[in-house]
């Protein structure tokens, strides 16, 4: 049986736009986990805090479930898919209304050994 060299963590239906999440995820993809955490700590963005939590969860999964060493881990995959959209309405002039789409995201981070 092949040895497992990667671990994954997912946050589902997170109340942040997938597009804004992807902008942050593009910065950490391919980096070591120490560099990725440092980048996320200094990114002034709601998505960065959520992604940092997912990354820490993936690191913990790698260490506890598969016995991987934190120093050897890199972010091999990081992506955000569209979750369910919360549909709301904003009242407008003359009794009309405009739709507002509050988007959600499914954020996935995969860490693997170098």
Swiss-Prot record:
Gene3D superfamilies, alphabetized: Ribosomal protein L22/L17
What SUPFAM superfamilies does the record tag this protein with?
Answer: Ribosomal protein L22
Give GO BP annotations, semicolon-separated: translation
A molecular function (GO) held by this record is:
structural constituent of ribosome
Tell me the Pfam families matching this sequence.
Answer: Ribosomal_L22 (PF00237)
Q: Does the keyword rRNA-binding apply?
A: yes
Function, as annotated, reads: This protein binds specifically to 23S rRNA; its binding is stimulated by other ribosomal proteins, e.g. L4, L17, and L20. It is important during the early stages of 50S assembly. It makes multiple contacts with different domains of the 23S rRNA in the assembled 50S subunit and ribosome. The globular domain of the protein is located near the polypeptide exit tunnel on the outside of the subunit, while an extended beta-hairpin is found that lines the wall of the exit tunnel in the center of the 70S ribosome.
Concerning its family, UniProt says: Belongs to the universal ribosomal protein uL22 family.
Its recorded name reads Large ribosomal subunit protein uL22
Which source organism does the UniProt entry give? Streptococcus suis (strain 05ZYH33)
User: Gene for this protein?
Assistant: rplV
């Amino acid at each position: 049986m092949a040895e497992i060299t990667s671990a994954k963590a997912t946050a589902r239906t997170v109340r942040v736009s997938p597009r804004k999440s992807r902008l942050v995820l593009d910065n950490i993809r391919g980096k070591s986990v120490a560099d990725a955490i440092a980048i996320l700590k200094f990114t002034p963005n709601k998505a960065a805090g959520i992604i940092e939590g997912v990354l820490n969860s993936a690191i913990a999964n790698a260490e506890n479930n598969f016995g991987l060493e934190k120093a050897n881990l890199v972010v091999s995959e990081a992506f955000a898919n569209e979750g369910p959209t919360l549909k709301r309405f904003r009242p407008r002039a003359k009794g009309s209304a405009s739709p507002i789409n509050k988007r959600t995201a499914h954020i996935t981070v995969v860490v693997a050994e170098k």
